[in-house]
Amino acid sequence: MSDFPGTEELESLDAYWRAANYLTVGQIYLQGNALLTRPLTLADVKPRLLGHWGTSPGLNLVYTHLNRLIHQYSLNVLFVTGPGHGGPALVAQAYLDGTYTELNPSVERNALGMARLFRQFSWPYGIGSHVGPHVPGSIHEGGELGYSLAHAYGAALDNPQLIVACVIGDGEAETGPLAASWHCNKFLNPARDGAVLPILHLNGYKIANPSVLSMISEEELTSLMYGYGYDPYFVEGDEPMEVHRALARTLDVIYEKISQIQRLARYAEDPQVVDRPLWPVLILRTPKGWTGPRYVDGQRVEGTWRSHQLPLADLDKPPHLMQLQQWLESYRPHELFDAQGTLLPELAALTPTGRRRMSANPHANGGLLLRALDLPHYADYCVPMPGPGQVRAEATRVLGGYVRDVMKNSLASQNFRLFGPDETASNRLDAVFEVTDKVWLDARASDDRHLSAQGRVMEILSEHICEGWLEGYLLTGRHGLFSCYEAFIHIVDSMINQHAKWLKTAAEVPWRKPIASLNILLTSHVWRQDHNGFSHQDPGLLDLLANKKANLARIYLPPDANCLLSVAEHCLRSRGYINVIVAGKQMEWQWLDCEAAAVHCQSGIGRWGWACHDDEMPEVVLACAGDVPTLEVLAAVTLLQEQAPDVRVRVVNVVDLMALQLSQQHPHGLSDSDFNGLFTEDRPVIFAFHGYPALIHRLIYKRANPQRFHVRGFREEGATTTPFDMAVINNLDRYQLLLDVFERVPRLQPQLEQARARYWATMEKHKLYLIEHGEDMPEVAQWRWTSASRA
């Protein structure tokens, strides 16, 4: 236990904090005169003032004190900034410890470099205002609020020497994801994982309102934290030296508490038995906009919502410009920097060195630590195939065997985890429980299964937390897979959107190394949620992902189990992408053997010769993307053989949806010649699609004669019904596809009225049978592939 702090040490801490605050204000306001070598003029001030001051002094306070803790105890600490709008504070800290200059040599540690540091902030073609990938030491931008604590816990998993300090703004604490994130402590194994120190910063206000947790009593807040399973430590005040003293002492106590928890767990007699500890949480209460202007134009600013962004605006008013000068001078920069603008040596000595610096922590640049997974060869798990449509299998159950051995092969390296919101078994991935369990540190009943403190499957009924854990795990250099019901992935589609923005920006930062891809398996999908109904039926994530940058977005729709295996192996090997795989879990007919699946998935799209009757030039192309659309297309082919056997039909299956785009638009896109080689230039195309039809039209709109594409897909008709009726009510069924052929092949026009009559008679028969028997007609339920190729 440290005997800190003495008066001299307190003054040094305060000086360092003042230096960070000075650099923070300078970034927000100044474009020149960085060291105040003369009185400020309007020319020294940026013409557009952008940035957030209110949270920044609190961030600088915490960061400064963590530096002291790291320095004293040689700790490995990762800093996660929940209120990411305090970006200038984190840039200031990286500049003070030297990391920023090491990575950006033009921003030197002198007056010229300081001026560049100031000018670039929130400046066109400079750097952004939040704690994005451009900020050394960051894994969390903190723009969209709610995810900081889940990211922090994801980073701590399997990192036993790491402490993740996560600052949570009191505004962010009101979000749903953050509220659920407090439960993450129940999944952290102190014997194997690192520690997370949540730091709840109560500065009282959001943009324009008081924050909830800052206004409740200390007794109520203490009860809340105890109820979540934390041991709360309070530090509060508005007098700097008193706060420095209290915070330093409290952090020493907290570190000793963390060390004690970990020692007890790591040297226990039975390492399999781990009692869930009461982890510490720091609750820090300081004024919003602390050390900034107390009053502006007669209105209180410091300690109020008015300090959230710019305490001083309209600097063309001389009193405001004078107040800015006084504000900057209050930090006494001449006591902090020498005449050349370099931080004084006695202050620079307060920072940790090398990788101990939080801004240089390699865990914040996870690609540096990333090791490839030891992947088994997926061909060893393929479904044996005597021929197309001869055997049935559950695609995700087959994948489960593969994932089991991915997990098994990674047990020693501890760099792979499986995540899901209480759905691993439901999604047929439960073979993984042959080699590991679900993480669980609390009480359990005698008939509970597959629960242990050593488990590597993360399940909590919160898609937000699963996604946040996985992102934190990936960003710190590991691998993972998130399986989720397709409809409920929308709960986190905004998180996925934010991760895409991070990846896009990180790829533009030269010193950032690529991380493992975000791999999402969507199952229990729209066409097989007939038992749960409309609320569980939504394929819309595909539309969202298709809007992302072409060098990030990947959408895969494997038609069967062997294709799913091929796609999954590819995704687990990949780097820097968001891979979404949509696959069913129900028993379905299988189409391609292992070798054919490998070739098909490598191409991403292809003509299925064994299903075609096109004699080189078809009269119609039947295309499909997704397992159920593939089934319905092949069933339509067999019906067409019965009713119009001489029609030349081509079947094209799409696994990689982005192959439909132009090669100039997407790296997986087909050239026009290859596209026309599959779809022709002028023949009608009937496209059965897993998702919303408009997405296909968007992807192919620049292709030859796009108006000839007629797309069937989900049209927002859902119910609790049978699997086939789901296709019927959305006009994706085989009988509708058959009618589409008659309507679009010119020489079949004389038979069109007869075809329509057959269609409506079949629909009436289907509905009556369904109502009477509650199941699909025998000709549907017992259908099998029987067509023989003439190709």
UniProtKB/Swiss-Prot annotation:
Any one GO MF annotation of this record: aldehyde-lyase activity
UniProt enzyme class: lyase
Keyword Disulfide bond: no
Protein keywords: Lyase, Thiamine pyrophosphate
InterPro entries according to UniProt: Phosphoketolase, THDP-binding, Transketo_C/PFOR_II, Xul5P/Fru6P_PKetolase, Xul5P/Fru6P_PKetolase_C, Xul5P/Fru6P_PKetolase_CS, Xul5P/Fru6P_PKetolase_N, Xul5P/Fru6P_PKetolase_ThDP_BS
Superkingdom of origin: Bacteria
Keyword Protein transport: no
Alphabetized Pfam families for the sequence: XFP, XFP_C, XFP_N
EC number: 4.1.2.-
Stored NCBIfam families: PRK05261.1-2, PRK05261.1-4, PRK05261.1-6
Family classification: Belongs to the XFP family.
Name of this chain's protein: Probable phosphoketolase
Source species: Pseudomonas putida (strain ATCC 700007 / DSM 6899 / JCM 31910 / BCRC 17059 / LMG 24140 / F1)
